[in-house]
Amino acid sequence: MSNIEKQAGELQEKLIAVNRVSKTVKGGRIMSFTALTVVGDGNGRVGFGYGKAREVPAAIQKAMEKARRNMINVALNEGTLQHPVKGSHTGSRVFMQPASEGTGIIAGGAMRAVLEVAGVHNVLSKAYGSTNPINVVRATIDALANMKSPEMVAAKRGKTVEEIWG
């Protein structure tokens, strides 16, 4: 949690991965850097960004800007998920389920960073297939975006929450 930066406007920013990439041209190789970041308000809003530049700080800055631009709202239930959810992107598949208070974030690598900045405090999760950070982040955000609160389901069906709970 120490490498999460608090920003003005209460956004938490987290750097997930920096990678050196190269383009081979006639005269040799052109090196550049890519950065993967996630941004969240710790209260159900989260977004990720992927930036590329000749220098690391510029790549990180581009990634942060992109992350702020494409944030989504996540319907959380008192610091955990509403229901078990699955998400996938290319070769990565993730499964997450709600956990009781005091469990903590049981998640690895890139998935943990997304859940921390989104404001999830208790969750059980597992990543299957590819553990490429970009794909895991996309799969995690896909799963969080597919999660529906009882209020959302009730509104979609044109019923009250009590009718849905049975």
Curated annotation (Swiss-Prot):
PROSITE patterns in alphabetical order: RIBOSOMAL_S5, S5_DSRBD
Keyword check for NADP: no
Segments forming domain S5 DRBM: 11-74
Family statement drawn from the similarity comment of this UniProt entry: Belongs to the universal ribosomal protein uS5 family.
Quaternary context: Part of the 30S ribosomal subunit. Contacts proteins S4 and S8.
Record-linked PANTHER family: MITOCHONDRIAL RIBOSOMAL PROTEIN S5
Function as written in the Swiss-Prot or TrEMBL entry: With S4 and S12 plays an important role in translational accuracy.
Protein name: Small ribosomal subunit protein uS5
